């Protein structure tokens, strides 16, 4: 019997699925006219006569003619109908049309292309086909984004044993969760560095786990089932690297694949629930205490000096909002106005003004608000005694409100600034000392400084500025003890001021010391002479600047002149 040979069209799209690739579906639907090369066409035609050369000649002429024409002159590489077919397949894949509607849409598109066949139509079809290819390529790139990490992970898993001594279900479930982590999370990578494999995650900061050391640490713990009281002692066997791996894998695990009875299942469940809750109950101190007991440290008092103890047992108090009622605020304004008027009109001290205000209150008004009035008056008395400036500002300010210390009883008044004149008996001491120092520095010359330093018994400023400033500061701070010396110093300064001459007095004395020059008087004759015609022989009465007399005498009216 002759063996029948079936014709199989070669396919070059093995990397993609036909159901997800419209171009591949179109290529497979038009495979005989698209992807057959010259040699493939000759082989296909000649295979029809293989074994029986008369078989090809016995076929209908139309079939033979089409096969020969296709083998000799193949069709265009990307004909129009294949572009339309690609678009129809993409529409079906995206759900725009149903599969049974594809033939009608394909036929309508072919008719429209044949009716409006032009360069624009071909370019539009080419652009649409390019968009389909780009979308498919992007989908493939997204799906295969972690191919490198998956390859490295598979290489690492190939080195692990397929079976473990106990806890095979937990072991298999953990490996599945690790694969799911690497494949689903975009910012997770697996790479090899030397003999070790590393898992790096960048979800909340960069975190790197040594997979080789972590699985080596987990090797004896896969099937361990520890009671509740013994879990703390077993937790000491886990390294921080292994705990980080369990924390990263825990969101992808469940209670079915990994049993909660095992110790690792208990930890994964704890991590998974902790990551799923936004608010955690702070039981860190209890956990640290239990760990300390498990390690053999029975003295719990040593843990009270740690920062963890201080933060855990710190009592958080919400600040209380203190405010006055409208009635209390009216009482405060009334007392402010009354005290300020007593101080300004009657010139009373703060304490006296408060006492007079309290004594003149109406009995019924005081009885109805006794507690608040006593509290307010006590606060004002304390402020007047401790901080008079603060008391004056509180009384004079029409918008003043009591601070928090008024309600709590913890009075915190601002400290009063210490000025230089606080140590003096009166303001005259400071004024007299300042005036004396200023006059000595400005009006005493060098001879008088030398004379006063050698004769006078009272201290005078030195010639240097430094000693003068030092003595001035000492005189300001230390009050005078000897009044006689003060009076004598004032008399000396008065005598020196009497001998001091101003510029005006010096000018007058210099003018008086000069000899007096007497000029002869010139008498003008009644008859004018015209000997010279230059006009300068006779002094002009309007340009008379020298000599004695009134220069404006010519402007004075003359008596006895008749009009």
From Swiss-Prot:
Residues 549-563 form a propeptide. Residues 148-261 are annotated as: Binding to hexon-linking protein. Cleaved near the C-terminus by the viral protease during virion maturation to form the mature protein. It is found in: Virion; Host nucleus. The modification Phosphothreonine is found at residue 284. InterPro entries: Hex_IIIa (IPR003479), Hex_IIIa_N (IPR043053). Induction: Expressed in the late phase of the viral replicative cycle. The modification Phosphoserine is found at residues 235, 452, 456, 475, 486. Structural component of the virion that acts as a cement protein on the capsid exterior which mediates the interactions between the hexons, including the peripentonal hexons, and reaches all the way to the penton vertices. Two hexon linking proteins IIIa, one from each facet, stabilize the unique edge interface between a pair of facets. As the virus enters the host cell, hexon linking proteins IIIa are shed concomitant with virion acidification in the endosome. Belongs to the adenoviridae hexon-linking protein IIIa family. Interacts with hexon proteins; this interaction tethers the peripentonal hexons to hexons situated in the facet. Interacts with the penton protein (via N-terminus). Interacts with packaging protein 3; this interaction is required to promote correct genome packaging. This is Pre-hexon-linking protein IIIa. The lineage of its organism: Viruses, Varidnaviria, Bamfordvirae, Preplasmiviricota, Tectiliviricetes.
